[in-house]
Amino acid sequence: VGKRFSIDRKRFYMTGHSGGARVAMQVALSTNQIAGVIASSAGYPDATPRASVPFVVFGTAGTEDFNHLEMRLLDRALTSPHRLAVFEGGHTLPPADVALAAVEWLELQAMKSGARPIDAALVDRLWQKREHAIESVATRSGTLPLLQAAVEDFTGLRDVAPATARATALGKDKAVIEALAHQQRVDAEEARTIDRMRTLEAGLQEPSKRRESLGDLEGILTRLSRSANAPADSLERQSARRILRTVTMGAAERTQDKDYLQMLAKYRLGR
């Protein structure tokens, strides 16, 4: 590509969705020529979180995406410049506004790193857009991460002192602290449930454990289905839907147990 087109060699970016995102990340990890990756609904090729990478990362995930938890864990572990945007939806490409936000974020990172000159007018325009997005959030717990992200993204490009002070104050709010802790508890329970179901699936292969494992799996699936079909949206409903999509996806590759596969088909969610 670099030979065929006139491209700024300091600004090679890659992107991909799901498996394509893993390929993009793998290429970026294997060379020092990639400035950044937009990773849609999947992260590293081995799905293992890293503390840092030599390129910037903008990740996206739907609230009911079966790779949602993976992307959240990537976000929590990574300390080098990155951002995660979550949108309402499943395992799909991000909506247009999120895709545009990803490109805008890459421009900010390029200015911060010196890969492109600082454009004060663009910085101000993107800051105003970010302020509008922050003010449109209905909850304080939802506002805090956006404020923190704005401070990180615009530090060195403009004055962020007022946003920093507001984020600091919100970070001490007891209701906000509890809401964020609740999110982490839901995430932890999601990971435990998936691990438990994988263990029970393995038990289906052992005659002495099969009956008990099948019964336990049905109990978990019944509980998840009840939460997944709750009328009101909640972190628990989103988590249940993600788990159901995770365990029903590729089930025939993990087990040949016909009774279990029929059970999963009964609980499979629509797109």
Q: How would you label these PLM feature ranges?
A:
Residues 58-61:
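Short beta-strand/loop motif that positions the catalytic acidic residue
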Residues 89-93, 150-166, 170, 207-215, ...:
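Short solvent-exposed coil/turn linkers within tandem alpha-helical repeat scaffolds
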Residues 72-75, 79-144, 148-149, 161-171:
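C-terminal catalytic histidine-bearing segment of alpha/beta-hydrolase fold enzymes
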Residues 112, 167-195:
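Alpha-helical linker/edge segments of TPR/alpha-solenoid repeat scaffolds
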Residues 32-45, 55-56:
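A conserved short beta-strand
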Residues 1-18:
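Gly/Ser-rich "nucleophile elbow"/oxyanion-hole loop immediately N-terminal to the catalytic nucleophile
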Residues 21-32, 37:
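Short glycine-enriched nucleophile-adjacent loop
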Residues 63-69, 92:
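Acidic catalytic loop of the alpha/beta-hydrolase fold
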